[in-house]
Amino acid sequence: MNWTAIVVETSTEAVDAVSYILTDTGATGVKIDDAADYQKLKPGKYGPYGEIVDPSTLPHREEGAAVTGYYPPTTFVPEKIADIRQRVAKLADFGLNPAPARVAAEEIDNQDWATAWQKYYHPVRVTRELTIVPQWEEYTPATADEKLLVLDPGMAFGTGTHPTTQLMLQALTIALRGGESMIDVGTGSGVLSIAAKQLGAGEVWAYDIDDVAVKSAKKNLALNPIAKDVHTGVNSLLDGIHTQVDLVVANILAEIILPLVPQAFENLKPGGKFLTSGIINTKFETVKKAIEAQGFVVDETMRIKDWYGIIAHKPAPEEA
């Protein structure tokens, strides 16, 4: 037997009351989709691990709210809907406007829970050479030069199509010539490490402060045989890392890039490149100045929408 989702279209001010009604009438879980919540989000807001939030990339309502309650198979739906409609209408007696107060129900196939979200993800060409492909998609490269980055978007840390990721993939395409060693800081899904291997990088290390991210990266790396030898580990930025590589890449936010800058400089060979993005436009000058103050030479800046990427290099002795 299948579960039932009962959806109440309502106003922002009535969301809490409607949620209570659904719970009180037997819903085992409630989901709130409120336009007001999306309006509060600002580009660059981030969580404890520097997750990037760009509201324009999130599916959302333009106005009002929808509160969905999930009811077990034993529920007598017609009676439940009538009860909910009556109780929602009475909210006006308590000074709340529940309009439009539409109530509808749909049956949920148990099998749909696991796979319904997959219909929103399709192969995306992110650079001339690189295409991101969801794990379940059958996809044939259009040209001999096209390289595939196979990801499982069902994991945490996104699909690789955010503007900052696109900037980093473009930067990798510019910077890599083949055989370079690289450290991927804040690897998340592992997409940059996979792309680097596809573009000819040599030895690659992928670090993240979050062990969930590292597990996600490992699974995605396993989906791409070319990246099977990428080293992974839990680490805070480059704390305790002392090596010499050709590239350090980081798609993290400005506040987190700043303490990374001296660590990146230390871990790069002379002439090595530092590629970074996750920089919202209001923080671009601050990050650029910090990179230059450390001794880097900024070679190129790139922009998509409100986000910036920077390609810089550590001067070789002959440049002094």
From Swiss-Prot:
Pfam family, one: PrmA
Gene Ontology MF, one: protein-lysine N-methyltransferase activity
GO CC annotation, single: cytoplasm
Keywords: Cytoplasm, Methyltransferase, S-adenosyl-L-methionine, Transferase
EC supergroup of this enzyme: transferase
UniProt xrefs under InterPro entries: Ribosomal_L11_MeTrfase_PrmA, Ribosomal_PrmA_MeTrfase, SAM-dependent_MTases_sf
List of residues binding S-adenosyl-L-methionine: 165, 186, 208, 251
Catalyzed reactions per annotation: L-lysyl-[protein] + 3 S-adenosyl-L-methionine = N(6),N(6),N(6)-trimethyl-L-lysyl-[protein] + 3 S-adenosyl-L-homocysteine + 3 H(+)
SUPFAM superfamilies, A to Z: S-adenosyl-L-methionine-dependent methyltransferases
Localization of this protein: Cytoplasm
EC number: 2.1.1.-
Biological processes annotated in GO: methylation
Main location: cytoplasm
Top-level taxon of origin: Bacteria
Role of this protein: Methylates ribosomal protein L11.
Entry similarity comment: Belongs to the methyltransferase superfamily. PrmA family.
HAMAP family recorded: Methyltr_PrmA
NCBIfam families: prmA
The name this protein goes by in its record: Ribosomal protein L11 methyltransferase
Organism whose genome encodes this protein: Limosilactobacillus fermentum (strain NBRC 3956 / LMG 18251)
